[in-house]
Swiss-Prot record:
Belongs to the universal ribosomal protein uS17 family. Transmembrane segments: none annotated. One of the primary rRNA binding proteins, it binds specifically to the 5'-end of 16S ribosomal RNA. Gene3D superfamilies: Nucleic acid-binding proteins (2.40.50.140). This is Small ribosomal subunit protein uS17. It comes from Glaesserella parasuis serovar 5 (strain SH0165) (Haemophilus parasuis). Part of the 30S ribosomal subunit. Keywords: Ribonucleoprotein, Ribosomal protein, RNA-binding, rRNA-binding. Pfam families: Ribosomal_S17. GO terms for biological process: translation. GO terms for cellular component: cytosolic small ribosomal subunit. GO terms for molecular function: rRNA binding; structural constituent of ribosome.
Length: 84
């Protein structure tokens, strides 16, 4: 059985938790009436076992089973480190 793992990229907006961080996923949607493209943001709580991701990093995350009330994504890799 070949499952296609759904991954998304986003920017880390908070890394204050232990083994977790919050990532903001940005997407564009078309306004239903006016047709203008608008930026929409979704925040996801992500599990990070080794505390690799830091504030400002661009990361790739994937869906997984629910790990807690809010966490249902895990870190795949850090795509780009934040400039210190």
């Amino acid at each position: 059985m070949t499952d296609k793992i759904r991954t998304v990229q986003g920017k880390v907006v908070s890394d204050k938790m232990d083994k977790s961080f919050v990532v903001a996923i940005e997407r564009t949607v078309k306004h239903p009436i006016y047709g203008k493209f608008i930026r929409r943001t979704t925040k996801l709580h992500v599990h990070d076992e080794n505390n690799e991701a830091k504030l400002g990093d661009v990361v790739e995350v994937k869906e997984c089973r629910p790990l807690s009330k809010t966490k249902s994504h895990t870190l795949v890799r850090v795509v780009e480190k934040a400039v210190a």
